[in-house]
Amino acid sequence: MSRIVYLDNNATTQMAPEVIEAVAQVESSVFGNASSMHTFGRRAGALVEDARLKVAQLLECETSEITFTSGASEANNTIFMIAKSLIEKRGSGRIVTSAVEHPSIIETVKYLKSIGIHVDLAPVGKDGRVIMSELEKLMGPDVVLTSIMTGNNETGAIMDIATISQMAHKCGSLMHTDATQAIGKIKVSCKEWNLDYLSCSGHKFYGPKGVGVLVAKKGVPFMPFVHGGEQEHGRRAGTYNTAAIYGLGIAAKLAMDGLEQENKMLWAMRERLREGIVKAIPNVVVNGSQEHCLTGTLDVSF
């Protein structure tokens, strides 16, 4: 009987056992609406805030800067719609992003272009990383938002977000990174990178599907994408998915505690796979940067 090996963790990871246990426990025993003021609601609300603290520690930001969403796609759309609103209010402005972003950004860019918003795409080199000299040429005082992913989901290329953030702020632009693929593989720091916005999804680091995070630095522009109730201080309406959010918090704690060990294991497995493929298949090309690469990603062509 043949053995099936799962090699699609950049699409989604299996929930960690600790996360599965936590989600199941909350689903079976904590059913109150986290926005309600009664005992059942406060109990659910406490779990949401526990998760918020863990996520803030993982991303090195303030708890007040975190907005829970349905995932990175929603967070990315929210951030780009904020930029759209700013450009429309000013009557001018541009967005700068890269040509290799996740579809939730690329497709949003297509929409924005269709309604007249100016968006420039920075190219990447053979190593899959944004060409910094080309990005710098695109920067200027009219750039409202610069958005570059932390790590690419196909090549694994890691971008120099700290330097790009400096470049963006130098010309007065807001800075966003989609860190979805990087969480749990490299240290991600909103404070060290001086980010205005960050987005990520729980299911890419052993957390539940359908839950994500939007970090918005205190004082930066924010316009809700989902309107309705006053959840998340009016930033994102909708009844809290308490179990998924709590599970996200558990996954965040696991990512913090196991970062070094996880990376060693992933890199060893990646190298074993790479060596096996190169040995078995002639003329294989390993794509992307091998120096600046997410440990769990291998991209080859033959």
Where would I find each of the regions flagged by the language model?
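Pyridoxal 5′-phosphate
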Residues: 1-302
